[in-house]
Design a protein with these regions (language model features):
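Condensing-enzyme catalytic core mediating Claisen C-C bond formation in acyl metabolism
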Residues: 1-27, 31, 113-117, 122-183
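Active-site pocket-shaping loop/turn-to-helix segments
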Residues: 14-35, 84-92, 96, 100
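Phosphate/pyrophosphate-binding loops at sites that engage ATP/ADP/AMP, CoA/4′-phosphopantetheine
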Residues: 34-52, 71-74, 104-105
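Beta-strand segments within the central parallel beta-sheet cores of soluble alpha/beta enzyme folds
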Residues: 49-56, 76-82, 109-116
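Glycine-rich phosphate-binding loops at beta-strand->alpha-helix junctions
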Residues: 54-66
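Conserved catalytic cysteine-centered active-site region
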Residues: 65-97
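Repeat-solenoid scaffold signature
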Residues: 85-121
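Cysteine-centered iron-sulfur cluster-binding motifs in ferredoxin-type domains/subunits
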Residues: 186-187
Length: 187
């Protein structure tokens, strides 16, 4: 466990405070993630050359390739991060990439899924013969192609609480205890 805080939000602040990107890349991604991967390799008794698909979402260009090189993973095994089509989906991003890989994976393939954010996680999967029976109802590619692009900037600002808006009487947060509910559950 490494206490590495790359961004934070002070109580009462509307936005996160991010540290310098170069520091996050060099001290975070390029030191912490390879350590997590190599620790996993030690525990599972495999090495980077055995990885068929390497998943590591990153907003930094080429960082995925640099991590692969540090861990002995063939750079051709790095999975594209889909950033140009879906942006940065946050904590769901590595799972979105995993779903995309599982749609084309073959039996016996090793899939390394990593994430970074205030530390790092590394998980190793190996597909079985059952992967041949996996037929998704919708592929990730089809979902992206059929997606609806949101071009209403005011809606974006509202959904991300970047503008104040009137929510109406029902939208107000009630911080009082509902006395009727409290009474009903008193025994």
């Amino acid at each position: 466990s490494i206490d590495f805080i790359d961004h934070f939000r002070q109580p009462g602040e509307e936005f996160d405070y991010n540290w310098e990107e170069r520091w996050i890349r060099d001290e975070g991604f390029l030191k912490i993630v390879p350590k997590a991967i190599n620790d996993l390799f030690d525990k599972t008794d495999i090495d980077g050359s055995e990885i068929d698909h390497f998943i590591i979402p990153s907003v930094f260009p080429r960082v995925d390739q640099m991590i692969a090189k540090k861990c002995g993973i063939d750079p051709d095994k790095v999975v594209g991060n889909m950033a140009l089509t879906v942006g940065n989906t946050g904590s769901a991003h590595s799972l979105l990439m995993l779903a995309s890989v599982l749609e084309r994976a073959k039996p016996g393939e090793k899939i390394l899924v990593c994430s970074f954010g205030n530390g790092s996680d590394a998980i190793l999967f190996e597909t079985t013969d059952n992967i041949k029976n996996f037929k998704p109802h919708q592929t990730i590619e089809n979902l992206i192609e059929a997606g609806v692009e949101e071009n209403n900037y005011l809606k974006y600002l509202t959904f991300n609480d970047l503008v104040k808006w009137e929510k109406g009487m029902r939208g107000e947060q009630d911080r009082k205890t509902a006395l009727t509910t409290l009474y009903r559950h008193n025994d």
